[in-house]
Amino acid sequence: TLINVLTGTTKTCALIGNPTEHSLSPTIHNSISFMTQNDMAYTTFCVEKDDLGDAVKGAYALGIQGMNVTVPHKENVMEHLVEIDPIAEAVGAVNTLIRVDGGFKGANTDLLGFARSLKEAGFDVKGKPACILGAGGVARAICFALVEAGIESIYILNRTKEKSLSIRNALNSYYGYKKVECHVFDYDYAEKLNIEDFLLVQTTNVGMYPHNADCILAADSSL
């Protein structure tokens, strides 16, 4: 295993979420730190929802240099930050906490990561529709990234419409009502959608550890 020898000067970064034991982030970051001779260690903390505020304050008090945030805390963690990047504020979710004076600043790199993935795959979304499954923090970021990339329309499918409507309102508030068409449906409406040549993005926690074999779409789904 490629990992630094920890000393009294080693800087610590971490991932917070629930669950976190399946994450590959420690392996990735610790290996990079070793190869670049960066005196940094990366670990994970499984944090319950009710303990989130205490966890953020405690991490700052303990000198944690920065943290990544995963489900289910990407939205709720925002109320415990001293500063938030403007685009992350508009998205309504953060996945990165940067140590600043007095606390942590929130940012969202999901937008950049998703946009880069589309570019590397050679997929041009301009003028096309997209169907988003789920309406959590990742879905919010992806919707903003799609608008930035020139998507024509977005269809958000979620179990309940409340979070989907929140995303639509956030998009309209930031970009204006004429920038993109955003439609909101529950999963029961999926088979009634009449769209072709669209981008499908699965953002729910279905298929995550420990239920890796689960799939949100049935094998014979018409979607």
Residue ranges and their predicted role:
Residues 6-121:
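Phosphate/diphosphate ligand-binding glycine-rich loop within oxidoreductases
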Residues 12, 41, 129, 152-154:
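Residues at the starts of beta-strands that form the adenosine-phosphate
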Residues 17, 108, 126-151, 158-159:
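Glycine-rich adenosine-cofactor-binding loop
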Residues 65, 152, 198-199:
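Conserved acidic residues
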Residues 120-124, 221-223:
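Glycine-rich helix-loop-beta junction characteristic of Rossmann-like nucleotide cofactor-binding loops
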Residues 151-175:
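NAD(P)-binding Rossmann-fold cofactor-contacting core
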Residues 180-223:
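Rossmann-like adenosine-cofactor binding region
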